[in-house]
Amino acid sequence: MPVISIIVPVYNVEKYIHQCIDSILLQTFTDFEVLLVDDGASDHSGSICDEYAHRDSRIRVFHQENAGVSVARNKGLCEAIGEYVTFVDSDDWIKPDYLNELYKCLLERNRGKGLILGSFEWVYPTRILPVSVEDMLLYHADFYRLITEFICGRMMYVWGKLFNRELIISKKIAFIPDVSCFEDMLFVLDYCCYADYILIKSNYNYCYRVSYSTDTLSSRINSYECELSICREFLLRLKLYQDYYAIADAEMQNAWRTITVLFHKVILAIYCHKNQYSYSKRIRYLRELTLNNRNEIKRMFLPAYLADKIAKYLLLYCSNVCFDIWMRFLYKINFRRMFGHKTN
């Protein structure tokens, strides 16, 4: 049985997948398996993965219909047999000592059921930006800092970390299938509910490729019901941590700012062109939203532009009809900037 399982969700990355897999095979720590999960790629990514599997017995490939990164990672977790698990995105790559450094940190803690994480580098087309973190050891009593400090930083991604697979299995921790925004943050928060410690090391062995997408925010929005469910999943976890660690509301500001985009997507889901909800359904959704989530709206609806400020005022202090008229007007004139994002 390998010590470490490396899970790589793969989707339309034929341009980068060679560099990703090659970097894994060049690891100085060699007791690992690689699980490449082809999430219905329409390019040659899947066949490239198969070629690597034929050449190296440590590689296993799984092909599935396109279901999203969360489902692909869950497939990897179901098939993994290693004692520990790490995730690598298929357009990123790792330096030769990535696994070795993480595992050495684990041995320092006599293994245990913790979370090991290192730092990383943002890789832009024209420059590389190392992300500096200080060496740190947190025990369970200190995990409130996940919410008060780290949630708004760069430490909540699922990659660049080493997880205990037994803990994941025993606590039935998994990625939520419909979540494609901050899905890794949910997983990390769930895992840390049961972890004994978090060990942070300032080694730059993970290289994160920063890509510039031409997608608009609306093109990445699901149905209203789906977006609301995702937002509630985050609110549930924030409330859990806040209650358990008795975190004051004033210390939750970083958390609210971080998940603002989720609430923005809930609102935009009502109005984005692909959903085409009727007037009566839009008003019903707005009524349900304001009736049951008024305090959360005040915290999460953080205006970035004048149009947003007007929208927030109408939603909270005027009628739902007024808000609906305003939002429909903005979409009718093809207004391009709402909630700090490009929407059309």
Region locations from a protein language model:
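Membrane-interface aromatic/basic loop that binds lipid-linked glycans or pyrophosphate carriers
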Residues: Y271-N344
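Short aromatic/hydrophobic "clamp" motif used to bind/position activated sugar donors
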Residues: V85
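Short loop->beta transition adjacent to catalytic acidic/histidine clusters or analogous donor-positioning motifs
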Residues: P2-I4, L25-L36, H44, D56-R60
